[in-house]
Amino acid sequence: KVAVLRQSIRDFQTQKALLTVPYTRTSHKQFEYKTIELEMDRPMKVIDQQIYDRAAKSGFPRNFFQESYFDHVTLYCMPDNANCNFSHFSDCSFHVCRLYGVKFWDTRLYGCEFHSCRIEFTLFPDSTLANTHFRDCSIHSAAFLRSRMTRCNTVDCSVGRLNFNGARLDGCTYGRITRLPNSRIEGLEDASITMGGATQEEVRYNRNAIFHALGEQDPEHPPASRDRPPGPER
């Protein structure tokens, strides 16, 4: 058991060292996919673990990640600037994966986890994230423009630039966050932060906790002003 554990640690360290190295394999080979229609007249390619592993080994074909249904897949590599627009990720894990310039436009991520990932210039506009968590990730820059996030947790992550303009955070939590140099949080004060079924006091507490975890001051709850004591009479 000790030998297995040591090998697992070595494999993890090897994979993590590759986070700064772009994935560059390409392929013109197309796979035979099953299709599924979750919306009328919008068929999606069904990607399982076997198809993903084969593509990762030989090189991802064009539009592999776009308009695709990923079902219980562990993703450990992606090409830079991958296009995941209009795709659906169900119970997937992004494990020690480099995401650089990846686009999740109008994408669904249900029950997913980003674990020990390096995330840079990645966009989630108009996407839905439910029960999707970020753990031990380095999030250098990401935008959740108009994203709908439900019960999503971000824990033990370092963050640089985040944009929450127009986002809706319902029952989301942030904890043990480290701010990177030159970091900036945008749009958080205008995001809709709610908790379904919670009291107004619980919602206020959660909102304050999110701002505090991200190192931001909530404009709705500015710090109490302290009156300066009067100076001595002259």
Language-model regions, residue ranges each:
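Non-Sec secretion/translocation targeting segments of pathogen effectors
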Residues: 1, 224-234
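Tandem repeat scaffolds
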Residues: 4-222
